[in-house]
């Protein structure tokens, strides 16, 4: 369920009068997503998405998110484009919530992505990193290494309810990552949540990236690590090096990783796995029955943490570099 706030047809028509989208012909709630209320609108000029931003989203972050989408779309990245109101602003108010009208993106997310899709994702991620250059607003990553210990404190006492020995294992893991987390890697705007359900395809062609509501400023290679975790593991927990090779080669066809990024990639992947483990663990333990948050199994990411812990070189992820001739 992703419609937390209902709207009436009359108030929607009044709201849309500030946009050049034609007359409303129909609208319906969209069940995808968990953070906001989303509606598919049909008007005499086409299809649009209406998003009402709920309390889980910090309203102070909305200028960053909407401005970023506008910036990326203007630079050729295929992503939803927030439409300006008559007053030039990208944000209005509907049913007491901040609200925006966003262009409709054709496509659907893949339930079973293959290597060729991973290559397209790598290309698109690198294109996003390049398109994000020059975006003037900044948003620190609240879910990077500095934010993991507060998350862990909230779940630590009950961790062994999920698996025996988990408390000690994660405490050791977190301490190691905090001590060894890299510094001075190339930074920029990252998506930070580019899971398969945030990438649309039309057939085998990538049609666009969506859901920029975790976007922030951080290491570019950390975004690559998130994608390795979210695109390149199979349901049985095994790493698919063919998918990894495709994703990394796709990324490097647009933006080449530095030597420092390549060296740091195993630790970034390990940290990325820990980040999603910790948020899943918190929701698993703290979400009351009947809540709208969909709980996801944290142990999926524990398996990934253990895999990355054994990695010695980025080549084990599928990164291939030809040596220069002597």
Curated annotation (Swiss-Prot):
It catalyses: L-homoserine + ATP = O-phospho-L-homoserine + ADP + H(+). GO terms for biological process: threonine biosynthetic process. Its EC number is 2.7.1.39. Keywords: Amino-acid biosynthesis, ATP-binding, Kinase, Nucleotide-binding, Threonine biosynthesis, Transferase. GO terms for molecular function: ATP binding; homoserine kinase activity. SUPFAM superfamilies: Protein kinase-like (PK-like) (SSF56112). CDD domains: HomoserineK_II (cd05153). It is an enzyme of class 2 (transferase). Pathway: Amino-acid biosynthesis; L-threonine biosynthesis; L-threonine from L-aspartate: step 4/5. Pfam families: APH (PF01636). InterPro entries: Aminoglycoside_PTrfase, Homoserine_kinase_II, Kinase-like_dom_sf, Pseudomonas-type_ThrB. NCBIfam families: PRK05231.1, thrB_alt. PANTHER family: AMINOGLYCOSIDE PHOSPHOTRANSFERASE DOMAIN-CONTAINING PROTEIN, AMINOGLYCOSIDE PHOSPHOTRANSFERASE DOMAIN-CONTAINING PROTEIN-RELATED. Belongs to the pseudomonas-type ThrB family. This is Homoserine kinase. It comes from Rhizobium meliloti (strain 1021) (Ensifer meliloti).
């Amino acid at each position: 369920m992703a419609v937390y706030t209902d709207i009436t047809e009359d108030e929607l028509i009044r709201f849309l009068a500030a946009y050049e989208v034609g007359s409303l012909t129909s609208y319906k709630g969209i069940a995808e997503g968990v953070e906001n209320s989303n509606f598919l609108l049909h008007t005499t000029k086409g299809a649009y998405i209406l998003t009402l931003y709920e309390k889980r989203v910090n309203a102070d972050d909305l200028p960053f998110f909407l401005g970023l989408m506008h910036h990326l779309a203007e630079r050729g990245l295929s992503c939803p484009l927030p439409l300006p109101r008559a007053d030039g602003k990208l944000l209005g108010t509907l049913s007491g919530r901040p609200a925006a009208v966003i262009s409709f993106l054709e496509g659907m997310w893949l339930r079973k992505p293959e290597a060729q899709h991973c290559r397209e994702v790598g290309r698109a991620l690198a294109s996003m990193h390049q398109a994000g250059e020059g975006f003037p607003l900044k948003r620190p990553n609240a879910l990077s290494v500095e934010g993991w210990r507060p998350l862990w404190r909230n779940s630590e006492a009950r961790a062994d309810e999920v698996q025996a020995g988990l408390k000690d294992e994660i405490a050791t893991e977190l301490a190691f990552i905090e001590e060894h987390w890299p510094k001075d890697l190339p930074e920029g705007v990252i998506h930070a949540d580019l899971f398969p359900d945030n990438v649309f395809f039309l057939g085998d062609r990538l049609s666009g990236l969506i859901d920029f509501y975790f976007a922030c400023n951080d290491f570019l290679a950390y975004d690559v690590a998130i994608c390795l975790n979210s695109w390149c593991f199979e349901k049985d927990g095994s790493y698919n090096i063919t998918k990894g090779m495709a994703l990394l080669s796709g990324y490097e066809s647009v933006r080449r990783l530095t030597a420092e990024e390549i060296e740091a990639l195993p630790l970034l992947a390990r940290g990325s796995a820990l980040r999603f483990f910790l948020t899943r663990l918190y929701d698993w333990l703290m979400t009351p029955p009947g809540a709208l948050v969909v709980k996801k199994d944290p142990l999926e990411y524990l398996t990934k943490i253990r895999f990355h812990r054994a990695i010695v070189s980025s080549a084990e992820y599928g990164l291939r570099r030809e040596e220069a001739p002597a």
